[in-house]
C-alpha cells in the first residue's frame, strides 16, 4: 500500500463497520482517507501509514504502525484494551465514557429504592400470595398508639431524606448518581482521585484515602469507579468492617473492585445489611454461589448500562472525536493511559 500524501491524514477502522455508519465517519473525517478493513491482513497492511485507528488495537498492529497519533477505543472501560506497548506509545487514546451515566444512575436508584422500601422482599412475598409487612403486621401504627409512636414497620422502611449516600468514584457516572440521590433529599458524600465536585450537589469530594470516613457515614455505598490498578480489590474485609451494619453496598463499577469472598462473608455474618450487584469478579456468577440465595442481595446480570439510547450516543462520540482529530484538536474523551481513565 502506498503511503498517504503528507497533507492527508488516514483513519483505519478494524473490525469493519457497516456502510451507513461508515458513510457518517467519512463525512466527519473531512478530507481524511478512511479505510474500513474487512480482515486482519488488510488491517495489518493499513496500519503502517495510518494516523488514527478505531477498533481493537493489538500489539501486532501497534508494532506495524509508523505514524499513529490517535487510537479510539470502542469501549468505556480499558482494563481489557490496554497493554504495555500501547501505554508506552506516544499516541493519544480516547474511550467511550459518558454514554451510560444517566442510565446507570437510574439503575443505582432502583437498587436504593428497593432496599429503602423493601420492594425486593415484597416481590418475593407477592409470589407466595403473602400479606406480610416487613416488621410484622401486629406492629402496624394506629392513631390509638398516640402521637410520635414509631412502629417496627416504620423502622424497617427507610426515609431517604434521612439517609446518606456515599459515591466511590465521582466521574460522569458518579456525578449523575449524586444528582439523582440529591433529588430524593439524600445527603451526598464522595471520594475520587481527582476530587471532582458536582456543582450545587457535592462540593466536598474527598480524596480516595478518606474512603474510611465515607464508609462510616454512609447508609448506601455506591461503587462507580472504573477498574484501574488503584481500584483492584479496593473493597475487602476491612472496608466492610468500616461500613455501618445497617448499610448497603451497590456495585455498578467493576466486579474486580470487590473481593467476592469477603463480600459474601460480610453478608452472611450480617456485617452489612445487603448488596445490590450488577457486576461480579466472576461473570456469569456461578449458579451455586451463595449470593443467589440471599434475601438481602439483589443481582442484575451486568445490565445497568442497557438502553436503546446507547448506540446513537456511541456513534455520536466517535464522530465528534473524528471531527476533532481532523481539525487538529484533542478528543473529548481523552484518557490517561497510565491511570486507565
Kindly give the residue locations of the regions a language model identified:
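Oxidoreductase and adenylate-handling cofactor-binding alpha/beta cores
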Residues: 105-124, 182-186, 316-324, 329
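Glycine-rich NAD(P)-binding loop of Rossmann-like domains
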Residues: 123-176
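Structural alpha-helical scaffold elements that stabilize or flank donor/cofactor-binding regions
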Residues: 43-46, 61-64, 213-214, 239, ...
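Phosphate/diphosphate ligand-binding glycine-rich loop within oxidoreductases
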Residues: 49-138
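Rossmann-like adenosine-cofactor binding region
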Residues: 189, 193-290
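Short, well-ordered coil/turn residues at beta-beta hairpins
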Residues: 14, 56, 74, 224-227, ...
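Rossmann-like dinucleotide-binding domain for NAD(H)/NADP(H)
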Residues: 246, 252-341
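N-terminal glycine-/charge-rich "phosphate-binding" loop or analogous flexible N-terminal tail
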Residues: 1-52, 326
Amino acid at each position: 500500500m502506498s503511503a498517504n500524501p503528507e497533507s492527508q491524514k488516514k483513519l483505519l477502522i478494524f473490525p469493519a463497520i457497516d456502510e451507513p455508519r461508515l458513510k457518517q465517519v467519512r463525512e466527519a473525517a473531512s478530507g481524511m482517507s478512511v479505510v474500513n478493513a474487512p480482515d486482519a491482513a488488510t488491517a495489518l497492511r493499513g496500519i503502517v501509514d495510518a494516523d488514527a485507528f478505531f477498533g481493537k488495537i493489538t500489539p501486532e498492529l501497534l508494532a506495524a504502525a509508523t505514524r499513529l497519533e490517535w487510537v479510539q477505543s470502542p469501549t468505556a472501560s480499558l482494563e481489557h484494551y490496554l497493554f504495555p506497548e500501547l501505554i508506552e506509545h506516544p499516541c493519544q487514546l480516547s474511550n467511550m465514557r459518558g454514554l451510560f451515566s444517566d442510565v446507570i444512575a437510574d439503575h443505582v436508584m432502583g437498587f436504593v429504592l428497593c432496599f429503602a422500601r423493601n420492594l425486593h422482599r415484597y416481590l418475593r412475598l407477592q409470589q407466595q400470595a403473602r400479606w406480610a409487612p416487613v416488621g410484622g403486621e401486629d406492629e402496624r401504627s394506629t392513631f390509638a398508639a398516640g402521637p410520635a409512636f414509631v412502629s417496627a414497620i416504620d423502622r424497617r422502611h427507610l426515609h431517604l431524606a434521612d439517609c446518606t449516600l456515599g459515591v466511590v468514584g465521582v466521574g460522569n457516572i458518579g456525578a449523575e448518581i449524586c444528582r439523582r440521590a440529591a433529588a430524593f433529599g439524600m445527603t451526598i458524600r464522595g471520594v475520587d482521585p481527582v476530587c471532582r465536585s458536582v456543582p450545587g450537589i457535592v462540593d466536598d469530594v474527598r480524596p480516595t484515602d478518606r474512603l474510611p470516613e465515607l464508609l462510616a457515614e454512609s447508609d448506601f455505598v455506591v461503587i462507580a469507579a472504573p477498574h484501574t490498578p488503584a481500584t483492584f480489590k479496593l473493597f475487602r474485609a476491612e472496608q466492610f468492617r468500616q461500613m455501618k451494619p445497617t448499610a448497603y453496598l451497590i456495585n455498578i463499577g467493576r466486579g474486580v473492585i470487590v473481593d467476592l469472598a469477603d463480600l459474601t462473608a460480610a453478608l452472611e455474618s450480617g456485617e452489612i445489611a445487603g448488596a445490590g450487584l450488577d457486576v461480579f469478579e466472576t461473570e456469569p456468577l456461578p449458579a451455586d454461589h451463595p449470593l443467589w440465595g440471599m434475601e438481602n442481595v439483589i443481582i442484575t446480570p451486568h445490565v445497568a448500562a442497557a438502553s436503546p439510547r446507547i448506540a446513537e450516543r456511541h456513534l455520536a462520540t466517535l464522530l465528534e472525536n473524528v471531527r476533532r482529530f481532523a481539525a487538529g484538536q484533542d478528543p473529548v474523551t481523552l484518557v490517561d493511559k497510565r491511570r486507565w481513565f
